[in-house]
């Protein structure tokens, strides 16, 4: 493309790869004026020579890094969910066609983009993901120990604590039923279990320390059922929450609202959508379960009368989901208003 055409550039799409980026750009008439492949290390030097414009990229690995880098250069980066770029793909799938689709999607006026995360948010998100992986691995290790014991005809009561308390007694008292090799295997798995416990405890402690130093986390933890994990997880996911105009938008993003399938003026609602962050939604649902387990505390909360009313006429699982939705909406209101939760004031919930 000529130098003259490049000066008319209004939008660029980047298909981000591990080592190579593919760029496609359009001018204000929709004419293709840029089609280029660059190395990752040449990102800054390449964009320094381009006119400042909208730069779209899919929400993928390193998208936030690329976005921050381009913003420093004066561009307007837009991180787009992959499902929003798919309708713009023409022809076969290749890197240039993907970049072209991203460039076209980035020009849409009502496009819902992913909010750019700060480095602190990414660090906090990484901590949560490490902890989540460790917890999953610990669960898998415990289940494998149980499976090997069942293969020997030995069953243990449900729960990790029950297995921990009885494992060595089983290995000692029923040594005739367990071969020496199997005993060594189970001992090795138990050592893995102890190591994972230590890693999880250390990671959880680090998250708790961060929650005590972060003002937004402190205010979020004034909400019933919300502790260090939810507060830091929410800050890592949405920052100050200003990407949403109201609390119900945040609840919808979190997937805690009914799926809508309406046509012909008839509204049909189904199960919850389960969109957005599965991890954060799970934490809010777990918080709702904890509150449901302690009905003696309900009168202390501003939403206590509502909770007593719905729990008397709906299935418990529906009540838990509705309560998780309410907690998420309260959390967004707390995050954006700069206030703390008032046990006896319901105005924050209504936003």
Regions found by a protein language model. Name each.
Residues 129-219:
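Glycine-rich, often acidic, oxyanion-interacting loops/wings at catalytic, nucleic-acid
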Residues 27-53:
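Nucleic-acid-processing active sites and adjacent nucleic-acid-binding tracks
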Residues 88, 219-316, 351:
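Phosphate-backbone recognition surface of nucleic-acid-processing proteins
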Residues 53-60, 102:
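Acidic beta-strand-to-loop metal/phosphate-binding motif
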Residues 6-26, 102:
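Gly/Thr-rich phosphate-binding beta-strand-loop-beta motif of the actin/hexokinase/Hsp70
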Residues 2-9, 201-226, 234-240:
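Extended, structured, electrostatic nucleic-acid-contact surfaces
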Residues 78-126, 167, 172, 266-275, ...:
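Short alpha-helix plus adjacent loop in nuclease-associated cores
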Residues 265, 305-351:
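Low-complexity, acidic/Ser/Thr- and charged residue-rich accessory regions of DNA metabolism proteins
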